[in-house]
Amino acid sequence: MLKPPVDAPIDVKDWIDNRPIAAYQWLILVLCFLIVLFDGFDVAVMGFIAPSLMQDWGLSRAAFGPVMSAGMVGLAIGALTAGPYADRLGRKKVLLIAVSGFSLLSLACAFARNPYELAVLRLLTGIALGAAMPNCTTLLAEYLPTRNRSLMITIMFTGFNMGSGLGGFLSAWLIPHHGWKSVLLAGGLLPLALLPLLWWLLPESARFLAARQAPASQIAAALAKLGGRFAAGTRFTVSEPTTQHKAPARQLFSERYRFGTLALWLTYFMGLLVIYLTMGWLPTLLRDGGLSIERAATITGLFQIGGAVGAIVVGWIMDRRNPNRVIAIAYALGGLCIVSLGALSLESSLLVVGVAAAGFCMSGAQTALNAFAPGYYPTEFRATGVSWMLGIGRFGAIFGSLIGGAVLSLGLGLPLLFTLLGLPAFAAALAILANGHARLRATPAVTAP
């Protein structure tokens, strides 16, 4: 069926919102899921190969520390720098460059001759990895109807956990037979094999094309893959704020977005602070409390499993209720679960339930925030908004990794330690509620010629 007359511009967002999900949108989800899966694999890979690598090179934990931290710093740099480029060059171009980058650099890591070379390569790999995830989020969000966006983006993000798990299984199989370098080679070759499919099948965002006032024929061709047929001369629009292509980063701090942007940053920072503190130091807390290493690791693993389930559930609820309140409630419940762990016996079965529930709420809220952010910003600087939130949040992860040891060395009791651990979760809940009070003014639409 042909679309409205040529004198009636078609709003790309409304057009997508008013149609059932097409097979091509599911294909975009699968492709983005695979990118995030390989992203998760590569982010976690150093932890899996560290024991073998340190033994092979005769390194102490202290000497290997810069290699581990270099990748995390790179993730923050990549997230902060990639967004503005994606808002100017396009989501697909930057995404292809990012995947090519972390694939080739992962291969290069396998041939590093010393920890200094490896640290530099992991920094560069982290930059490419940091650029990939926010662009996956933005591209997928711009092709999804609002009614399903949160759920489908959270499904995409479960690929990160699955990629981390895949890294563990592959490492357990490859390292005994082929050594630690084989894991890095696998981490480079697998996404490299995906690149031709991404180049061929992954589209540029139709909303990005409309916001940049690309020729209507390009927009029509992109929407045709979703089943659209348009009369010759049809014009396309995005009914969103327009800034006449001013620097995307500047728009984050404009009067309209400044407060909400800072609230998002605080939310993401605090959420990752809690998650990295928990994942990094909970095994040590449990071990110091008398549990075996195996049981401490198993209980901590339930945090991630609960998080994968929580991400999908929170995303599903977000599509049906006020997203700010849903995320705030999840963070607050996560904080309560973490605080309650300090009152439980380490031998109690309730401890297992409490850790899984904390992961369900905390990781569920954190992943849901990834789905929330694309809807907060307009197309013109959406990639910048999402990527800067992720980049600032990475500093929460770095801070959490750094202060954990110092806090444990204070010799505080478990109840007080878990209370301190839960406090940032309540701060995250308040911050996302504050974001809900940021009001956006209506502005004219942008029409593609």
Curated annotation (Swiss-Prot):
Please name the PROSITE patterns in this protein's record. MFS (PS50850), SUGAR_TRANSPORT_1 (PS00216), SUGAR_TRANSPORT_2 (PS00217)
Q: Where in the cell is it found?
A: Membrane
- Extract the SUPFAM superfamilies matched here: MFS general substrate transporter (SSF103473)
Q: Which GO terms describe its molecular function?
A: carboxylic acid transmembrane transporter activity
List the record's Gene Ontology CC terms alphabetically: plasma membrane
Gene3D superfamilies, alphabetized = MFS general substrate transporter like domains
Arranged from A to Z, the UniProt key words for this protein are:
Membrane, Sugar transport, Transmembrane, Transmembrane helix, Transport
Q: Where are the transmembrane segments?
A: 26-46, 62-82, 92-112, 123-143, 155-175, 183-203, 262-282, 298-318, 326-346, 349-369, 388-408, 414-434
- How would you describe this protein's topology in the membrane? Multi-pass membrane protein
Give the function comment from the record.
Transporter that specifically mediates the uptake of gallate.
* Protein family (similarity comment): Belongs to the major facilitator superfamily. Sugar transporter (TC 2.A.1.1) family.
Query: What is the official name of this protein in its record?
Result: Gallate transporter
Q: What organism is this sequence from? A: Pseudomonas putida (Arthrobacter siderocapsulatus)
High-level lineage: Bacteria, Pseudomonadati, Pseudomonadota, Gammaproteobacteria, Pseudomonadales
Name the encoding gene, please: galT
